[in-house]
């Protein structure tokens, strides 16, 4: 069903059983998959490819030009997976040619009211972005991450899978997998034990991750000192391997 007040470009590709409510605008080069719902006043622009079963609440702006002064009108892209929910007033921008020209959103994510995801971000699956989260350009977010309300993430930061930020957190460095941070100075607060339990991690795996956390944050080690210890632990603990590899590959440095 497409409401008569909505404007749909002739070049847009609209899938089966898509519901487009009043006063929506679908621009050129947009592709919307089957069973999506645009409630009302939703704008989708640019080279935006949207998967199946996504729901966009009113006043979402999807695939708009990036907020980067270097942007000069180049063709850039947005890809969104399946089964995502974008609540009221979410903004998701396309990429830039300075990166890979692509912003990519995975599947089964929940973007609560007024979330902003900037150009060139890569977001995985099953994440929750609480109200008023702002994610700056080039940020990479793993899977099953929870960003508390009003979290702000600096450009180029990476946030590992299963991480958690408290409400109002300001993230200026990389957040390793499993780690919780809070406050305006992104202070580590331990591992996301409750979240790991809910996701089926065994008690022994959680204990191994806790031991690895202590190596990084509680034993007085620098990152360089912690890495050999983590690598040794990772030989028998796959979940610690994920943590060790993340820390080793961090370009901005990890939260401390």
For every predicted segment, state its role.
Residues 1-5, 10-11, 16-17, 53, ...:
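Terminal amphipathic alpha-helical/low-complexity segments used for targeting or macromolecular assembly
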Residues 1-182, 186-187:
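Structural signal for interior beta-strand "rungs" in well-ordered beta-sheet cores
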């Amino acid at each position: 069903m497409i409401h008569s007040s909505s404007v749909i470009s002739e070049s847009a590709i609209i899938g089966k059983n898509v519901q487009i409510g009043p006063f929506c605008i679908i621009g050129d080069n947009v592709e919307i998959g089957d069973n999506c719902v645009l409630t009302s006043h939703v704008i989708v622009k640019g080279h935006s490819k949207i998967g199946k079963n996504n729901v966009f609440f009113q006043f979402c702006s999807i695939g708009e030009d990036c907020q980067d002064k270097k942007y000069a009108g180049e063709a850039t892209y947005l890809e969104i997976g399946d089964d995502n929910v974008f609540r009221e007033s979410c903004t998701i921008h396309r990429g830039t040619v300075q990166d890979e020209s692509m912003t990519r959103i995975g599947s089964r994510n929940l973007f609560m009211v007024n979330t902003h995801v900037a150009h060139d971000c890569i977001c995985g699956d099953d994440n929750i972005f609480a109200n008023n989260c702002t994610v700056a350009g080039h940020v990479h977010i793993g899977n099953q991450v929870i960003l508390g309300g009003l979290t702000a993430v600096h450009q180029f930061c990476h946030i590992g899978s299963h991480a958690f930020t408290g409400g109002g957190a300001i993230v200026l460095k990389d957040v390793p997998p499993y780690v919780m941070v809070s406050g305006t100075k992104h202070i580590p607060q331990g591992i996301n034990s409750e979240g790991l339990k809910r996701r089926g991690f065994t008690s022994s795996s959680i204990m191994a991750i806790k031991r690895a956390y202590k190596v990084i944050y509680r034993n007085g080690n620098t990152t360089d000192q912690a890495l050999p210890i983590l690598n040794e632990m990772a030989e028998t603990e796959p979940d610690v391997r994920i943590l060790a590899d993340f820390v080793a590959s961090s370009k901005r440095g990890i939260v401390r």
